[in-house]
Each structure stands twice: as C-alpha cells, then as structure tokens.
Swiss-Prot record:
Posttranslational mods: This protein undergoes a protein self splicing that involves a post-translational excision of the intervening region (intein) followed by peptide ligation.
Protein's organism: Mycobacterium xenopi
Keywords assigned by UniProt, alphabetized: ATP-binding, Autocatalytic cleavage, Cytoplasm, DNA-binding, Isomerase, Nucleotide-binding, Protein splicing, Topoisomerase
GO CC aspect terms: cytoplasm; DNA topoisomerase type II (double strand cut, ATP-hydrolyzing) complex
PANTHER family according to UniProt: DNA GYRASE SUBUNIT A, CHLOROPLASTIC_MITOCHONDRIAL (PTHR43493:SF5), DNA GYRASE/TOPOISOMERASE SUBUNIT A (PTHR43493)
Family label: Belongs to the type II topoisomerase GyrA/ParC subunit family.
Function recorded in the entry: A type II topoisomerase that negatively supercoils closed circular double-stranded (ds) DNA in an ATP-dependent manner to modulate DNA topology and maintain chromosomes in an underwound state. Negative supercoiling favors strand separation, and DNA replication, transcription, recombination and repair, all of which involve strand separation. Also able to catalyze the interconversion of other topological isomers of dsDNA rings, including catenanes and knotted rings. Type II topoisomerases break and join 2 DNA strands simultaneously in an ATP-dependent manner.
Note: Few gyrases are as efficient as E.coli at forming negative supercoils. Not all organisms have 2 type II topoisomerases; in organisms with a single type II topoisomerase this enzyme also has to decatenate newly replicated chromosomes.
Record protein name field: DNA gyrase subunit A
Residues that span the membrane, as ranges: none
Enzyme Commission no: 5.6.2.2
Lineage of source species: Bacteria, Bacillati, Actinomycetota, Actinomycetes, Mycobacteriales
C-alpha cells in the first residue's frame, strides 16, 4: 500500500508465488519490475525504490541479495557495526525493525529502519588488490566503475558479474586516516582525487575534451567521495547466513566494508490501489487458489481502466493484437 512503509521486493514475490503462482519467481519479479518502469507503462502501478533498470536496457537489480554477518556497516562519526550484531539473535528468514543511522553512497547519514536475515545461501568473496573484501550472495549488487563505450560510468554489478581487473567503488568516508584505508580532505591523499586515480578517465578526456558534458562526468568521478579499487579475485566462500538493510533513500544504498551496496523495494502506486478498491466488499467473486489454502479473486474490481490506459499485446489464433496506451 502506498500509505505504508515500503516492502522488500523479494517479500512481495515470495507471497505472490506462495499464494497464487507456484511456477517460479522469475516471471513474477520481471512483471513487478515492468510495472515500476515509467518507460514501460504509461501509468506505473508499482512505486519502485532502488535500481529498476533504465530505458537503455540496463538490467534491474536482483530481488534478493545479501551480505555475510561479518560485513561492517559504516555509521556516522567514523563508527561501524557488524551487520549481524545490529539485531542480536535475529532469526533466519525474518525482518526486524531497527532505528539506525548509516552512511549512504555519498557518505551522508541516512535512516535504516529494517534488518533482514535471509537465512543461509551460497556466497562469494570479492577481494581488491589493496586487500579490501566483502562477501555476499552471487546476485548482490556492488557499485563499480565501468567502461561504457569509452565513457567511465558508475554502474551496479552483481557479484557473479564482477571479474578480476574490474574496479569496485569504495566510499572514502568509510575509512579513517588513522587506519588502513582511504580518506578525503587530507593532503596526503589528494593525488587520488584527480584523473590519475580514475581508470580510463584520462583517455576519455583526451578524446572528448571539447565536449561540454565531459567536464561534468570528470567532476562527478573526481570529487573525492570515491576510490576505485581494482578487483584481484572473486572466490567461493561456501554457504553462510546473510543479511540486508532497508535504507530510507531513493537508491537504498549503504556502505559495507567500504563497498557500496543497495537493494530494491516496491509498494503499489495510488492508481494501482484503485484497481483493488473495495475488493473485500463482495464486488467480485472469489475461488480457491491452486492448493485450496486461500481464496483468490476471479477478476479485479478495476475502477481504473488499466487495459486501455497502459495498453497490452498478445497473440491468438496466429494473429497479433496490440492495444496502444491511451490518455
């Protein structure tokens, strides 16, 4: 519901699969993602929070991804806490209310209001040349510096997509000058804030120095917030308990062992609620679901004409039929 706190995407998919669609979670999540994309639907039915792809065919983040309990979550004032210690004794496959200030991708304090213990899953360790490391599930996204057609760009990559030689983004404020790591605003670290510290940026500027957008790209990458650490290895770390946080920002990013992590959430939009309005007031018929445990509606009340407004397409008897979206 749009008037309540956001729900983790994996939870919405799991409940849908358990109650109405026992054929796997991939098609459910793909549908959820599409309903959140304003370039896919004229009137989105899901208010996506996090990485739901882009018009340029960038893929959305995975619905469930987590990190191991030893990951240090960056807090304000240079402090940190093991993610497993945020809620001591959290039960597997549980979500737990918290009230904790953490650092976002820019190093600013933001509110984390939920800790998820996602049970035990296969995990992999990403280790950089400098010795920084983080361990998480194969579909856990980390912010990376990626060469996109010659343009150095910040993009989310899943751990199973990260290879030795890639560059992981490290948040500088997660480290102190009194320990191993990196910091901004200190003279001894100043050279790393210039182009020499951003792989591919010098080559990009040499080729595009007359492009007015080139300076903006360079400014974003060299403003001192990030260090770009070369990945040395990605190795199997067995099966371990994993955790995640819900962060109250647009991209839900938080810092773990210096790496930038994030997740996705998805409540319905107010318009989608009009499709469900008064569904519990005998407006439509209900039948048993696939296993007879709960009831499901045969149709939705649909005060909002979704088929006309958002359009649709299909094939029947060898003929394609398309309904364009209407105002």
């Amino acid at each position: 519901r749009p008037d309540r706190s956001h729900a983790k995407s994996a939870r919405s998919v799991a409940e849908t699969m358990g109650n109405y669609h026992p054929h796997g979670d991939a098609s459910i999540y793909d549908t959820l993602v599409r309903m959140a994309q304003p370039w896919s639907m004229r009137y989105p039915l899901v208010d996506g929070q996090g990485n739901f792809g882009s018009p340029g065919n960038d893929p959305p983040a995975a619905m469930r991804y987590c990190i191991t309990g030893d990951a240090l979550v960056a807090l304000p004032e240079g402090e940190s806490v093991r993610i497993a210690d945020i809620v001591p004794g959290a039960r597997p496959n549980s979500d737990n209310a918290i009230d904790l200030k953490v650092l976002d991708r820019h190093g600013n304090p933001v509110l984390a209001d939920r800790l998820f213990h996602s049970g035990e899953h296969p995990v992999y360790t990403v280790r950089t040349v400098e010795g920084l490391r983080v361990t998480g599930t194969a579909n856990h996204p980390l912010l990376c510096l990626v060469d996109v057609a010659g343009v150095p760009t910040l993009l989310w990559k899943l751990i199973d997509e990260i290879k030795p030689g890639d560059y992981a983004v490290i948040q500088r404020s997660a480290f102190s000058v009194d320990c191993a790591g990196f910091a901004r605003g200190k003279p001894e670290f100043a050279p790393t804030t210039y182009t020499v510290g951003v792989p591919g940026l010098v080559r990009f500027l040499e080729a595009h120095h007359r492009d007015p957008d080139a300076q903006a790209i360079a400014d974003e990458l060299t403003d001192g917030r990030f260090y770009y650490a070369k990945v040395a290895s990605v190795t199997d770390a067995g099966v371990q308990p994993v955790y995640s946080l819900r962060v109250d920002t647009a991209d839900h990013a938080f810092i773990t062992n210096g790496f930038v992590s994030h997740n996705t959430e998805a409540p319905l939009t107010p318009l989608a609620m009009e499709m469900l309005r008064e569904i519990d007031e005998e407006t439509v018929d209900f039948i048993p679901n696939y296993d007879g445990r709960v009831q499901e509606p045969t149709v939705l009340p649909s005060r909002f004409p979704n088929l006309l407004a958002n359009g649709s397409g299909g094939i029947a008897v060898g003929m394609a039929t398309n309904i364009p979206p209407h105002n």
